A protein has these predicted regions:
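Short loop/turn segments that connect beta-strands within beta-propeller blades
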Residues: 87-91, 130-134, 170-173, 210-214, ...
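A short helix->beta-strand "capping" segment at the edge of beta-propeller domains
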Residues: 42-60
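Bacterial N-terminal signal peptides
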Residues: 1-11
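Sequence/structural signature of beta-propeller modules
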Residues: 9-48
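Extracytoplasmic beta-rich repeat domains
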Residues: 24-27, 34-37, 55-68, 93-114, ...
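Beta-propeller domains
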Residues: 79-81, 86-88
Length: 373
């Protein structure tokens, strides 16, 4: 492990709070991938039980990037390399920013903070763009593709790259604070809790790195390639692997508490976990959504879709929202897994839902952004 950069000694704030308080996204905002830096995927918004399609926006190219929603504006990236701001109420575009002429924005999802929108592209650049005007403010070049989503923690912006480094940059000017070296690609987005960034990688190691100075404080073999981002709550962390397992780890003892694998369907987990009401809920490439008891690792329920589920589920008001490669957005009962509602977009959904202001927003592979409410 190599750490390069400055040591920043000021206290960390996560969404204006310390410790593990910021586990649920506020009702009106979904400021980054999975809603909060802890990546729990939970919103406090009240969403209508019977959803209706409010509007669509044609972005012109496929959308793998998951939306951020702040102050009534939706931010989304596309494979054309554009970062687009769209009005949440009307679906009308506010501005477009061209991130790269040569490479698109893949799965890196925007994060909003300090009046800026941060997003990575497949040319390896992290972009900071003024949230109100769409003007570029700064860029930072890495040596590999960025599919990881940026996370804003106080004055730090964290992002992983396919060059094997986790970077911490100054939110205001993009200056390098530190970088932490792993042994392979970093695809996952780091989850931050109690001042530590937790993430897995393609080197089969799950790590915790202190945000203040980039020093490693947690290291445990995951036993498999990990593309999924973790969810952290309390002293537990949950994530899926390409060895067809979901793991529950104890952050204090640095031990694996349980491993979940479906008894008949043995497929990788690319989706990032949702952690809510004692359940870990995750999509699988076996076409299923799995709900797992967070204490025991035992199956609670499963729901079968028509194709792989790479979309990461989100929850609000007792319901689970998730997209599938079959083109449908599903709404499931959190307790039973029974289908409440679905909508056929007619194109695969690999992006993840964003929930804010009573609305659910998701992009599709045919470049259409959908808003339901």
């Amino acid at each position: 492990m190599i750490v390069v950069g400055l040591i920043v000694g000021q206290p960390l704030l996560v969404c204006g709070q310390t410790g593990n308080e910021a586990l649920v996204a506020p009702p009106d905002d979904w400021s980054q991938f999975r809603g909060t830096p802890a990546l729990t995927g939970v919103s406090s918004a009240q969403v209508p039980q019977n959803l209706e399609l409010l509007w669509t926006f044609d972005a012109g190219e496929s959308i793998d990037s998951s939306a951020a929603i702040v102050d009534g504006t939706v931010y989304i990236g596309t494979y054309l390399g554009e970062l687009i701001a769209v009005d949440l109420e009307t679906g009308k575009p506010k501005w477009r920013y061209q991130a790269s002429e040569d490479a698109g924005i893949g799965e890196s999802s925007p994060a909003v903070g300090h009046g800026l929108v941060f997003v990575g592209d497949l040319a390896g650049q992290l972009h900071a763009v003024a949230s109100d005007t769409g003007d570029g403010v700064w860029t930072f070049q890495t040596e590999g593709e960025i599919k990881s989503s940026p996370v804003v923690v106080g004055e730090h912006v964290l992002v992983g790259s396919y060059d094997g480094y986790l970077y911490s940059l100054s939110a205001t000017d993009g200056a390098l604070i530190w970088k932490y070296e792993t042994l392979n690609y970093i695809h996952a987005t780091p989850a931050v809790a109690d001042g530590v960034a937790y993430f897995g990688g393609c080197d089969e190691v799950f790590r915790g790195v202190r945000v203040a100075d980039g020093v490693e404080v947690f290291n445990l073999s995951a036993g498999a390639y990990t593309a999924a981002s973790p969810a952290v709550i309390g002293n537990r962390v949950y994530f899926g692997t390409f060895d067809n397992e979901v793991l529950g780890l104890d952050l204090l003892s640095q031990e694996v508490l349980w491993r979940y694998e479906h008894h008949t369907r043995h497929f990788p987990f690319y989706s990032s976990a949702l952690n809510v009401d004692g359940k870990v809920i995750i999509g699988g490439r076996d076409r299923m959504v799995h709900a797992i008891d967070e204490q025991t690792g035992e199956e609670v329920w499963t729901f079968m879709t028509g194709a792989r589920v790479d979309s990461s589920p989100a929850a609000a008001d007792g319901r689970v929202y998730v997209g599938s490669g079959d083109g449908r957005l599903y709404v499931l009962d959190l307790e039973t897994g029974e289908k409440i509602w679905d909508f056929d977009t007619a194109a695969p959904l690999f992006a993840s839902p964003a929930i804010a202001d009573g609305k659910v927003v998701i992009g599709s592979q045919d470049g259409v952004l959908y808003c339901f409410g």
